[in-house]
């Protein structure tokens, strides 16, 4: 069976799963509880909802002014086999954000926040670095992502658990992938 773009879309699932696996393995080897290592806990519902609404507004306003999302063209979805659509959404909209947030707002934020840089430095470094890993985007889009990274970092600091930035990032990518 020949499915166009299967390999590329399969990698969108495999790579985040590998990153998540490495984070989990590192926590187990170092015997660190998830709450300590990456801030895994249930966030305060009202605060998480507030951050999600703020982030949704950032997404919509930034897209209104920069039109980074592009046109609402569903041709690619109609023409692709269902497995490709499932892999694309799973990889880009769910697993990718989980992996990136575990690394940036989980491990890196947690480590930098405990240094002389403090929380502000941790938020700035993770936001700028996260924007930089999207180097294939336009400079304006990278700047937009750095701003998004600051919001993700602020949400991590204000609500404590990493779940809030993960949900925010998933929201962004769901909007972007469609």
Mark where each language-model region is:
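Alpha-helical transmembrane segments in multi-pass membrane proteins
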Residues: 1-30
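Juxtamembrane helix-loop-helix connectors linking adjacent transmembrane helices
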Residues: 2-9, 32-96, 110, 114
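Short linear motifs at secondary-structure transitions and domain/linker junctions
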Residues: 12-14, 26-28, 65-73, 105, ...
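Structural signal for the C-terminal ends of transmembrane alpha-helices
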Residues: 24-34, 155-158
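Transmembrane helix-loop-helix hairpins at the membrane interface
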Residues: 56-68, 83-178
